């Protein structure tokens, strides 16, 4: 019994301990577990709800995506069609432009090739024609016939007048022109009372005074001041040169400074002109004017073919006396004797170049010599020497055309091939075969 009671007490104690120390934690654990399960069930329910919502959203999104995709595809198809149409239109326009451009280029190339062909054909035709002409005029008779044909054409020209005057007048203005004419008349009156030696002296003294005035610009400017009272100018020239020149020269100088001149240099030109007239007067008295004129002109042609000599005569770094000595040495070495009057005229011209090229100054001198006789000078170029009959006929024809006696100055240029080229003053009559060939070539298309 006691054992039973003991066991009962022990069991009661164990129950007590279990109730107080085991049951509460277990209960709490069970409650916690229950709450956890309940919460998990709630969360599972919520997750299921969310899954349903997600499924619904996915389904809706899928349907929306399909609709959007269909819309995008439809728009893309429409855009593609529009782009294709635009590209096709642009391609058509570009193709048409390329066709037009190609057609223009083909036409341009065709025109260019045609022009080149014409040009080559034209040049070849001119070359062949030139060759035929050269072969034709190689015969002296045929070449002479070209001159005759030109003279026939020239003879048919309408006559027209040409006034003959001192070439220097063409370079001067009205006041100087009147002054030069008056001075030339004064010289003509004085020259009647002078012998040839006095005219030589007059020419030399006038050249010396002209050289002095060319150096002394201030003096020249004072002597050409356009005032009514010429007494101070006459007094000045008397004081400067009366002790060094003769009375005829002083008379010319007084008359010169009494005139009104348009430019300072015209006075020097006038004195040079009168000095030339003095020498040409001597040549006329001695019946040598034709020889003097021909030799002066021939020397101008020499300067054409000897440019080195022209350069030496133009070299102003060399004193004028040295250039005159060079001129005299050249003339002395000539195969024929040079007329002393021609030598004097050429020497004066070289001394008084005053910036003018020697070739132009000497050619101008030849024109002065011709003009003194009231003749027109015609510079004629030919491919070969013309016959005396042709020269006579040319002189007669030109004299009828210009209404004055004409002096023909010939020069030979084989490059002219045939015909003649005539220069009278500023007028050129070109009837050469070479000019016809050049004109034919110039008329070819570019």
Swiss-Prot record:
NCBIfam families per record: PRK13428.1, PRK13430.1
Subunit organization: F-type ATPases have 2 components, F(1) - the catalytic core - and F(0) - the membrane proton channel. F(1) has five subunits: alpha(3), beta(3), gamma(1), delta(1), epsilon(1). F(0) has three main subunits: a(1), b(2) and c(10-14). The alpha and beta chains form an alternating ring which encloses part of the gamma chain. F(1) is attached to F(0) by a central stalk formed by the gamma and epsilon chains, while a peripheral stalk is formed by the delta and b chains.
Name of the gene encoding the protein in the UniProt record: atpFH
Listed CDD domains: ATP-synt_Fo_b
Annotated transmembrane regions: 4-24
Keywords: ATP synthesis, Cell membrane, CF(0), CF(1), Hydrogen ion transport, Ion transport, Membrane, Multifunctional enzyme, Transmembrane, Transmembrane helix, Transport
Subcellular location: Cell membrane
GO molecular function terms listed in the Swiss-Prot or TrEMBL record: proton-transporting ATP synthase activity, rotational mechanism
Membrane topology type: Single-pass membrane protein
One Pfam family named in its UniProt record: OSCP
Chain spans, region ATP synthase subunit b: 1-168
One CC-aspect GO term: plasma membrane
Protein name per UniProt: ATP synthase subunit b-delta
Principal location listed in the UniProt entry: membrane
The protein's role, per its UniProt record: F(1)F(0) ATP synthase produces ATP from ADP in the presence of a proton or sodium gradient. F-type ATPases consist of two structural domains, F(1) containing the extramembraneous catalytic core and F(0) containing the membrane proton channel, linked together by a central stalk and a peripheral stalk. During catalysis, ATP synthesis in the catalytic domain of F(1) is coupled via a rotary mechanism of the central stalk subunits to proton translocation. This fusion protein includes a component of the F(0) channel (subunit b) and of the F(1) subunit (subunit delta). Two copies of subunit b and one of delta together form the peripheral 'stator' stalk which links F(1) to F(0).
Domain of life the protein comes from: Bacteria
Region of interest (ATP synthase subunit delta), residue spans: 169-446
Xref: InterPro entries: ATP_synth_B-like_membr_sf (IPR028987), ATP_synth_b/b'su_bac/chlpt (IPR002146), ATPase_OSCP/dsu (IPR000711)
Keyword Metal-binding: no
């Amino acid at each position: 019994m006691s054992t039973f009671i003991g066991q009962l007490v022990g069991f009661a104690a164990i129950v007590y301990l279990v109730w107080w120390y085991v049951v509460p934690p277990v209960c709490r654990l069970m409650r916690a577990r229950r709450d956890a399960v309940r919460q998990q069930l709630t969360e599972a329910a919520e997750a299921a709800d969310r899954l349903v919502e997600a499924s619904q959203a996915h389904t809706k999104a899928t349907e929306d995506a399909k609709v959007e995709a269909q819309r995008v595809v439809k728009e893309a198809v429409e855009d593609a069609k529009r782009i294709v149409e635009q590209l096709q239109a642009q391609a058509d326009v570009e193709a048409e432009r390329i066709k037009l451009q190609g057609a223009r280029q083909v036409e341009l190339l065709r025109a260019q090739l045609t022009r080149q062909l014409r040009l080559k054909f034209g040049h070849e035709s001119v070359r062949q024609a030139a060759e035929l002409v050269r072969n034709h005029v190689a015969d002296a008779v045929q070449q002479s016939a070209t001159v005759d044909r030109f003279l026939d054409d020239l003879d048919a020209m309408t006559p027209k007048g040409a006034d003959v005057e001192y070439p220097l007048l063409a370079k001067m203005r009205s006041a100087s022109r009147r002054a030069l004419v008056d001075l030339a008349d004064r010289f003509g009156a004085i020259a009647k009372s002078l012998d040839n030696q006095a005219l030589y002296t007059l020419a030399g003294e006038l050249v010396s005074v002209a050289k002095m005035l060319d150096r002394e610009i201030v003096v020249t400017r004072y002597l050409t001041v356009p005032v009514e009272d010429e007494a101070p100018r006459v007094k000045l020239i008397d004081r400067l040169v009366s002790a060094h020149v003769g009375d005829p020269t002083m008379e010319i100088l007084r008359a010169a400074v009494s005139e009104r001149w348009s430019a300072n240099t015209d006075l020097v030109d006038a004195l040079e002109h009168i000095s030339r007239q003095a020498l040409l007067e001597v040549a006329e008295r001695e019946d040598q004017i034709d020889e003097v004129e021909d030799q002066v002109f021939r020397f101008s042609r020499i300067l054409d073919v000897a440019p080195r000599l022209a350069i030496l005569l133009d070299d102003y770094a060399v004193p004028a006396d040295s250039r005159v000595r060079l001129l005299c040495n050249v003339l002395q070495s000539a195969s024929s004797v040079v007329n002393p009057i021609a030598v004097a005229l050429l020497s004066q011209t070289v001394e008084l170049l005053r910036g003018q090229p020697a070739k132009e100054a000497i050619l101008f001198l030849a024109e002065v010599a011709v003009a003194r006789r009231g003749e027109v000078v015609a510079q004629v170029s030919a491919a070969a020497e013309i016959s005396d009959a042709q020269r006579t006929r040319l002189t007669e024809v030109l004299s009828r055309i210009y209404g004055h006696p004409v002096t023909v100055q010939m020069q030979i240029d084989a490059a002219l091939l045939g015909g003649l080229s005539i220069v009278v003053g500023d007028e050129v009559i070109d009837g050469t075969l070479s000019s016809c060939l050049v004109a034919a070539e110039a008329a070819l298309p570019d």
